[in-house]
UniProtKB/Swiss-Prot annotation:
Organism, as annotated: Orientia tsutsugamushi (strain Boryong)
Lineage start: Bacteria, Pseudomonadati, Pseudomonadota, Alphaproteobacteria, Rickettsiales
InterPro entries: aa-tRNA-synt_IIb, aa-tRNA-synth_II, aa-tRNA-synth_II/BPL/LPL, Anticodon-bd, Anticodon-bd_dom_sf, Beta-grasp_dom_sf, TGS, TGS-like
UniProt family annotation: Belongs to the class-II aminoacyl-tRNA synthetase family.
One annotated Gene Ontology cellular component of this protein: cytoplasm
The protein's name: Threonine--tRNA ligase
Amino acid sequence: MIDIILPDGSVKQYKIGVTGQEIIQSLSISLFKKTIAVEINNELIDLYIPIINTATVKAITIDSVQGIEILRHDTAHILAQAVKKLFPDTQVVIGPVIKDGFYYDFARDKPFTNKDLEVIEQEMQDIIAKNDLIQREVWLRAKAIEFFKQQKEFYKVKLIEEIPESEEISIYRQGNFVDLCRGPHSPSTGYCTKYFKLTKVSGAYWRGNSKNEVLQRIYGTAWEKKSDLDSYLHRLSEAQKRDHRKLGRELELFHFQDEAQGMPFWHDKGWTIFKIIKNYISCQIQRAGYIEVNTPMVLSQKLWEKSGHWEKFRENMFTLDTNVAEKDHNLIKDSIETKCALALKPMNCPGHIQIFNYTIKSYRDLPLRMAEFGSCHRYEPSGALYGLMRVRSFVQDDAHIFCTEDQITDETIKFCHLLKQVYQDFGFPEVKIKFSDRPEKRAGTDKIWDKAEQALIHAIQTLGEEYTINRGEGAFYGPKLEFILTDAIGREWQCGTLQVDFVLPERLNASYISSEGSKKRPVILHRAILGSFERFIGILIEHYSGRLPIWLAPIQVAVVSITDEAVNYAKQLHQELIDNNIRSTLDISNQKINYKIRNFFTAKVPLIAILGKKESESGKIAIRTLGSQEQQVISSSELIAHIRKNKK
């Protein structure tokens, strides 16, 4: 007999070789009906795997986070099985679970169509209805390689060859379909939900490397309940309507083109938004005691080697071949294989330390809060680029706080206050905090880590904020906080960060004179609120569906005339608004008023000032607000006051 320890701490005895299925069934039939896998000693395994030693056992139900992930993993395998049946010449590659769904990569000459997805979905429903057993088998490496070679599944062969010799080769069989997989899975295909949807097809490089062949990736989502699926599809539909790439084109904010992949061309209205945000942040950090600096965009390879970025980040850096540059100053190479002396900065921190080191610092100078709207460049594979959300050139609202260990808590509290105010002003009142503690491989002593972790946690607790812990997810040089905001359709975006760093001050020889007169290393707090301006603007566009609040709108008021008699009054009002630093545009064309209103509302202009003969004679303004059919009659001074009241 063996002891089985249950989640409530109680211990029951079972025969050696008992399965998780038998244990859960003996405890509760209602629990068993919802269980699709078990957790044995903190490891997820299939329900029918024998247990031969004393173990802790926990049921994984279909309505749990882990259960939903297994359900989605099952659905990915069923997708692959359906594709193999319908399109036998297709090679199946990999099919992991992702946030809210799954995908499976396929190698196939002919592209999948939307009609194909419909046929595949029906075949998947048929597979679920058959309720075939899903069985795990362990094969010898040679047998697995030979089997998949015979099946002409050459990607599976490559995957098996990459599995370490110490690991077993696990295979899952359902019906006549066999796939390489670690598992776990449900007991049969009938456990899998019928509430799934294949959402799209896209290209994906094998292994994410642009030098490799392009595969076809079918994305899908799966949920326990129909209501959950419907809710997700509604959010997906809303997200498509709000897509910042589409709105960016329609509103003439920015565009991308092949000659500068991943680098936005900002149009006047988009650049206006950019400048508004920059000016706002600049004012906020000035009030919070930051100094604002600017550091070179191109820095020597030697500095990047000292900082450690060259070793760890080189593949993501754009480099400049100075030998070639002497002949052609415009030629910049991004090949990492070329020995280069200069690199475009991917981050601002080494430059900030150069400014810190330029003069001798005393403990009285700390904390020193140094900010920069630094223009950075990072190489991202072309397949990973995604509008403003994933770019190669970007501006960060970056800052570094040079402080002592004893100042970490106070500086964290001050930063959190600043961050929450900024998010509130931009329309994101809810902020989630994640705390990432020490990883297994790390720099610094346990004593330093203890102090830094306790300082961050004490700051969060002092603020009365809830937080979740990401065990072992801190950087090797220090613990960190991540700040996540939620948009209008419930999506979460990680934007803000605060990262404690013990390592960079040592590498770049940053020091200050302590109260005892000795040299000491400062702690650096890397922190950002928005992250990159580009990504944050993309988030704002989608959050507001392009209808930015008055203070952020590139055009705040459109002044339009109805009749020729009102043209001079319209010009006068337009100029008055401009003189009061209000972003106004003027339309005195002969187009019909409904056409003008429709055009400006399509352009998401918050306010339209409509002027006819009546308004011209009275000196009043008929105001229409975006999304409203009603008109309000006010004076120009009232309009100006209204807009100023909304200014942040």
